[in-house]
Amino acid sequence: MGILRFVLLISLNLVLFGFKTTVSQPQQQAQVPCLFIFGDSLVDNGNNNRLLSLARANYRPYGIDFPQGTTGRFTNGRTYVDALAQILGFRNYIPPYSRIRGQAILRGANFASGAAGIRDETGDNLGAHTSMNQQVELYTTAVQQMLRYFRGDTNELQRYLSRCIFYSGMGSNDYLNNYFMPDFYSTSTNYNDKTFAESLIKNYTQQLTRLYQFGARKVIVTGVGQIGCIPYQLARYNNRNNSTGRCNEKINNAIVVFNTQVKKLVDRLNKGQLKGAKFVYLDSYKSTYDLAVNGAAYGFEVVDKGCCGVGRNNGQITCLPLQTPCPDRTKYLFWDAFHPTETANILLAKSNFYSRAYTYPINIQELANL
């Protein structure tokens, strides 16, 4: 097992050290015609801005390093999907669906919403948000909008959508803002780790299948990262006598159960359950673990604290309006109590695009070229 991890790290180093933590200028033409994004605050780029929600990031210093400033992204600069869109060659970032007008929908849309989950009630403790079911329904509406630009020719629209990439990153909030919040939700009483993961997978299968029914053929499905080790959890467990370390391993163990089921789901979908589709699984748990454990190799000096936040690990309270963040965000793995920095997002996007170290069964570049 140690040899395997060594080989993975060497391969990732070869990928990452061949690049700076910037994304090159887009190519003349994008490798795919459009990119559709479904997810939570890790990839939300402004859909929550006008909602009555605590899950918003439309204030400084969020966006301090982003060319357009504060937009609603939950980081200092680009999100993972921003970096991915640039690598794919898009001239502009994929806009939030809440602000798309006219033919812009033909290049894709971002439906992601902070606090969203696979389950509809997930994130209700934080206020309004757009759940995965709601995001999928918004996408079906978008498909109807797109049809007019194909003169009502559904076959032509299907051929167009079959060349696009669909990204889905869900599950984190189903644990952080549902299963492991017993004072607000009853799921931990009604389920155990195994049955809760099975329930999520059942719902997720239906959601991904509906995307397929409305044209999705090249689909990226991410696992959940090592969220038991984010600054918020480290702050809570910092002073506890925990023989396994400062992370909340109870959460991590539950995530491993879920991720195992997501990877199996990808296998099932690729083996003919959805004809003509190709799904790629991103192992976010392994990639975030390796970035944290080997942070110095990737230029990170701080891997256990947020760049912006309050309290232990800058994780007891997340980044506040007009708070002064750390001066050099490139040295931090985490931007706030929950979310990675732009630097981490770019590293992860590049590794997933060019390497199979954390992708299965192929990488994103190979998916785009299908």
From Swiss-Prot:
Enzyme Commission numbers on file:
3.1.1.-
InterPro entries attached here?
A: GDSL, GDSL_esterase/lipase, SGNH_hydro_sf, SGNH_plant_lipase-like
Q: Give the annotated active site.
A: 41, 336, 339
Keyword Glycoprotein part of the UniProt annotation: yes
* GO cellular component annotations of the record: extracellular region
Glycan attachment sites: 203, 241-242
**Where is this chain primarily localised?**
secreted
Q: Which compartments does it reside in?
A: Secreted
Keyword Lipid metabolism attributed = yes
A GO BP annotation:
lipid catabolic process
Assigned keywords, A-Z: Glycoprotein, Hydrolase, Lipid degradation, Lipid metabolism, Secreted, Signal
Protein name as catalogued: GDSL esterase/lipase At1g33811
- The record lists the organism as Arabidopsis thaliana (Mouse-ear cress)
